[in-house]
Amino acid sequence: MTEAKTLAGRVVIVTGGNRGIGLAIARLLAEDGASVVVSGRDAARLDAAVKELESLGAPALGVPADATKREDADRLVEVTRERFGRIDVLVNNAGITRDQLLVRMKDDDWDQVLDTNLRGVFLMTRAVGKVMMRQKSGRIINIASAAGAMGNPGQVNYSAAKAGVIGLTKASGRELAHWNILVNAVAPGLIETDMAAAIPAEAREAMLQQVPLKRIGQGREVAEVVRFLAGDGASYVTGQTIHVNGGLYV
């Protein structure tokens, strides 16, 4: 018997959905029947992501967008509405790292990470929130990080931004509940991505030793939690952060 596609008919935006965790999320939601819009700065990666999603039988669209620019956020929302008529789920996934010790960190390293990882979430949540308020329904899922809960040396910018995402999730979850808009966060730990692959082997091994499950997580394991939050089974969950980290932070 064919398994029912529980997200059939729903329209999803995944920012930064052209690579890494974002692409894993877009892929799984497409497999589950959703129409998926992915955004990112790299046009070639966007095209490749759209082709992959369409190969799964999903209506898909790639929109070049810079997460730090209000006009790009507004355009992404408008293009999605023009193509699909509504927005049911927003996954705020776009993010960057600019790691450095606190005393050596440049102003630009701080500003770029906060702009992309926190301001970008605010801009997209505000833009999509207006649409969902008119619909009187919606799901917003923010990709946070274990770093936002526990802090990471060499990542004061990233940790601060992701802690801000967790706070934004709590506040907007309470504020938007009146319109039946549920806002939650998923906080991954060490996940197999391009970012993780760039970590020096010695540092990567040291991080892995802190994970009780003694392995690196996979993007699909994060995506499965996003799918839950996007679906009907999470209809009484809002303002929460679900950690996917192999026990790194509990």
Regions found by a protein language model. Name each.
Residues V11, N18-R19, D42:
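Conserved glycine-rich cofactor-binding loop
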Residues A43, P64-L76, D107, R220:
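The beta1-alpha1 cofactor-binding region of Rossmann-like NAD(H)/NADP(H)-dependent oxidoreductases
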Residues F84, F122, M133, S137, ...:
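C-terminal substrate-recognition "lid" of short-chain dehydrogenase/reductases
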Residues L101-L102, D109-L114, A196, M207:
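Substrate-binding pocket helix/loop in short-chain dehydrogenase/reductase
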Residues T125, A161, T169:
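Active-site helix of classical SDR
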Residues K130, R174-H178, S235:
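Alpha-helical segment proximal to the catalytic Tyr-Lys
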Residues S145:
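Residue(s) in the substrate-gating loop at a strand-loop-helix junction
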